[in-house]
Amino acid sequence: HWHLVYPIEAPDRSIVDKDRRGELFYYMHQQIIARYNAERYNAERLSNHMARVQPFNNLDEPIAEGYFPKM
């Protein structure tokens, strides 16, 4: 969605050179992450007999791979 609204190679630079563009980028991604941390998402996971979402606090810790498509 972000790259459709603010295309990198826009023919008219006035489309992508917006004031507060970084703030909008941060807000959009914060909303996406909030969706995964919401109780609604945990309710969906719990109804499918899955564990709650684990918080990701340590940025130095490696992320466990949950899916490997080339198996």
From Swiss-Prot:
Modification(s) after translation: Upon activation, a trypsin type protease cleaves prophenol oxidase to yield the active enzyme.
Cofactor comment: Binds 2 copper ions per subunit.
Cofactor: Cu(2+)
Binding site for Cu cation: 3, 29
Annotated GO CC locations: extracellular region
Keyword vocabulary terms for this entry: Copper, Melanin biosynthesis, Metal-binding, Monooxygenase, Oxidoreductase, Secreted, Zymogen
Biological process (GO), any one: melanin biosynthetic process
Swiss-Prot/TrEMBL catalytic activity: 2 L-dopa + O2 = 2 L-dopaquinone + 2 H2O; L-tyrosine + O2 = L-dopaquinone + H2O
Functional summary from the UniProt entry: This is a copper-containing oxidase that functions in the formation of pigments such as melanins and other polyphenolic compounds. Catalyzes the rate-limiting conversions of tyrosine to DOPA, DOPA to DOPA-quinone and possibly 5,6 dihydroxyindole to indole-5'6 quinone.
Family: Belongs to the tyrosinase family.
Name of protein: Phenoloxidase 3
High-level lineage: Eukaryota, Metazoa, Ecdysozoa, Arthropoda, Hexapoda
Gene from which this protein is expressed: PPO3
